[in-house]
């Protein structure tokens, strides 16, 4: 949950030889179960107090959960951005409007250790960007801190507390 120090850290890469280890494979299974039980569409390892560069996501109802390890994202600026109304399992009951790229190139290892590169669009791209932010110690609420700092104390008092 918000306030936990692991959520603000830049996560460490997973060594390639560790991807198929029992520890990582068990963590993957546990994260998928946790994500589904919470009704989420994504969950990053830092959200379960593991500061490693991995997340799971299930942006489509009838597809299997995807495992994304050591991802890199290239933002496709020419495709433009859009406002995304997002919730986060680390900030229950709150939603934030965040500007996201419509299209990204995503490179990562899957749970079998295979290297994958693909172009992601739409909701899948948004979920990937949200979870990727977690790997860099960024929460959706962080996008609003610079705005809040410029408000008067009276205006800040009107903002709901997390």
Predicted regions and their residues:
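Active-site rim/adjacent substrate-binding subdomains
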Residues: 1-129, 133-162
């Amino acid at each position: 949950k918000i306030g936990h120090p692991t959520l603000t850290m830049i996560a460490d890469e997973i060594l390639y030889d560790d991807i198929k280890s029992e520890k990582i494979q068990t963590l993957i299974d546990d994260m998928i179960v946790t994500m589904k039980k919470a009704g989420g569409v994504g969950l990053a390892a830092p959200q379960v107090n593991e500061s490693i560069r991995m997340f799971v996501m299930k942006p489509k109802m009838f597809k299997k959960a995807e495992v994304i390890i050591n991802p890199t994202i290239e933002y496709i600026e020419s495709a433009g951005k859009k406002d995304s109304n997002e919730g986060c399992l680390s900030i229950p009951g709150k939603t934030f409007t965040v500007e996201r790229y419509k299209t990204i190139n995503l490179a990562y290892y899957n749970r079998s250790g295979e290297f994958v590169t693909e172009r992601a669009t739409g909701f899948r791209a948004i979920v990937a960007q949200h979870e990727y932010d977690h790997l860099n110690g960024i929460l959706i609420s962080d996008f609003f801190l610079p705005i809040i700092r410029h408000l008067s104390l009276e205006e800040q008092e009107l903002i709901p507390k997390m």
